[in-house]
Amino acid sequence: MKRTHLFIAGLYLLASCRAEEGLNFPTYDGKDRVVSLTEKNFKQVLKKYDVLCLYYHESVSSDKVAQKQFQLKEIVLELVAQVLEHKDIGFVMVDAKKEAKLAKKLGFDEEGSLYVLKGDRTIEFDGEFAADVLVEFLLDLIEDPVEIINSKLEVQAFERIEDQIKLIGFFKSEESEYYKAFEEAAEHFQPYIKFFATFDKGVAKKLSLKMNEVDFYEPFMDEPIAIPDKPYTEEELVEFVKEHQRPTLRRLRPEDMFETWEDDLNGIHIVAFAERSDPDGYEFLEILKQVARDNTDNPDLSIVWIDPDDFPLLVAYWEKTFKIDLFKPQIGVVNVTDADSVWMEIPDDDDLPTAEELEDWIEDVLSGKINTEDDDNEEGDDGDDDEDDDDDDGNNSDEESNDDSDDDDE
């Protein structure tokens, strides 16, 4: 009887827990919201939505692993479509083989990519194919390209954004032709780069902005760069941002991780791992910031900072690939072609390198004194020796064969 009472009490508690509302994570409800895009329905679908999210994929083969991988991607898209159902966003898939003509028309050339059509723009998503990352990316994309700052509290919030590129301009009003040019320029980089503006003289004074002036903030830098030759056209602003788009120190973010990784310097990245929430990681990041600030004018220097907390699924892979321990800060040089790497020796967490020691190590990397090819050369030498041995063996075999032939002739 006692067990029966406990069982009933357990069921009651379980029912009570399920009745709680407010923290229900979405699960796929089974409804199909993602459709296949074809030449026939393209115009109809395009008219229906302000924003269209397209997954361009290779034809699904009979291979079971490939089918599973495709189904996982499809479920992610279905869940994102479900979560954003109240927004004016459409979700479609384009088969590379069946719809080759349509793909060519849309300019799609990379199978497995996700593209977003918004107005006359095509934005390629270069981030982690995960539901939460995609939802945040799309929500940022449908917002206004420029965020307006009206108060000192909003200035404080603006100043706290330190780990990404941001721009802010001071204009007379939203009707100003120079603000409109700024807004048009912002659309080129949305949602990856944040554009802010103010029409408030008090805010402009606090930020040391002059009328029609735009300041460019590089990540982790104390002072902005005032874009020269104001007022600017849309084209001038776009050109300036593109020229300064590779910061001295940049954070690897889930929403644009592949774009950042592909933006290497001569085939290598200087990579730093540091957990911001960890005291040693925080200290190491502060040292990295100091090095970046002291070397911000060096066009050959760009450090990619990775917080392992942002990529829990990749930690084991990185530790195995780079042969490092990510429970402590690390900095190394990585070859993006084959993932060969060389890492600075950091004895322990209590003996982190100083900014000067870090600069000396980085100088050795940039000069080529420290590089990822040394091990390859050693392995290559071993390989050459083996090849020579093989050649010798091969020659001996030929000689033996010739001897055998002579014997047969006799």
Swiss-Prot record:
Pfam families: Calsequestrin
Mod. after translation: Phosphorylation in the C-terminus, probably by CK2, moderately increases calcium buffering capacity.
Keywords recorded for this protein, A-Z: Calcium, Glycoprotein, Metal-binding, Muscle protein, Phosphoprotein, Sarcoplasmic reticulum, Signal
GO cellular component term, pick one: sarcoplasmic reticulum
Gene Ontology MF terms: calcium ion binding
Superkingdom of origin: Eukaryota
Residues annotated with Phosphoserine modification: S397, S401, S405
Regions of compositional bias (Acidic residues) in chain numbering: 373-410
UniProt-listed GO biological process terms: regulation of cardiac muscle contraction by regulation of the release of sequestered calcium ion; regulation of release of sequestered calcium ion into cytosol by sarcoplasmic reticulum
Region of interest called Calcium regulated hydrophobic site, as start-end residue ranges on this chain: 221-242
Sites carrying sugar chains: N335, N395
Tissue: Detected in heart muscle (at protein level).
Signal peptide interval: 1-19
Function: Calsequestrin is a high-capacity, moderate affinity, calcium-binding protein and thus acts as an internal calcium store in muscle. Calcium ions are bound by clusters of acidic residues at the protein surface, especially at the interface between subunits. Can bind around 60 Ca(2+) ions. Regulates the release of lumenal Ca(2+) via the calcium release channel RYR2; this plays an important role in triggering muscle contraction. Plays a role in excitation-contraction coupling in the heart and in regulating the rate of heart beats.
Matching PANTHER family: CALSEQUESTRIN, CALSEQUESTRIN-2
Subunit structure: Interacts with ASPH. Monomer, homodimer and homooligomer. Mostly monomeric in the absence of calcium. Forms higher oligomers in a calcium-dependent manner. Dimers associate to form tetramers, that then form linear homomer chains. Interacts with TRDN.
Family affiliation: Belongs to the calsequestrin family.
Protein name: Calsequestrin-2
Species the sequence originates in: Canis lupus familiaris
Organism lineage: Eukaryota, Metazoa, Chordata, Craniata, Vertebrata
Gene this protein is translated from: CASQ2
